[in-house]
Amino acid sequence: MRHRSGLRKLNRTSSHRQAMFRNMANSLLRHEVIKTTLPKAKELRRVVEPLITLGKKPSLSNRRLAFNRMRDREMVVKLFDVLGPRFAERNGGYLRILKFGFRDGDNAPLALIELLDRPDEGEEGANVSEAAAA
């Protein structure tokens, strides 16, 4: 039976996959928008959304859980001090995934993954749409 086997392996070992998603999660929380392939973006959503939910409840145990998953003190501080209050009224759905064309070398589908409710979202959204049109 194929029940509960929904994890994408992405042609990597489990340790490589874990390290890759840890790095991608840190990059997404640092820059609030990143460009990657579509399957990686969809799988990254499963990693980052629970982290933001942890950030909404600032307790010592939640900070330790977040640090255990991210391994970056600076991003844990941002998660609990900036992103947690920003998404306090939102019940899930903290990310947006936009298809972004295809990569030149191997024609892999690309995607932009970004946090919602960014302070400069209006300006960045215009730049992203111009880049997508080009």
From Swiss-Prot:
It comes from the Bacteria. One of its GO terms (cellular component) is cytosolic large ribosomal subunit. InterPro entries: Ribosomal_bL17 (IPR000456), Ribosomal_bL17_CS (IPR047859), Ribosomal_bL17_sf (IPR036373). GO terms for biological process: translation. PROSITE patterns: RIBOSOMAL_L17 (PS01167). One of its GO terms (molecular function) is structural constituent of ribosome. Keywords: Ribonucleoprotein, Ribosomal protein. It holds the Pfam family Ribosomal_L17. NCBIfam families: L17 (TIGR00059). Part of the 50S ribosomal subunit. Contacts protein L32. Belongs to the bacterial ribosomal protein bL17 family. This is Large ribosomal subunit protein bL17. The lineage of its organism: Bacteria, Pseudomonadati, Pseudomonadota, Betaproteobacteria, Rhodocyclales.
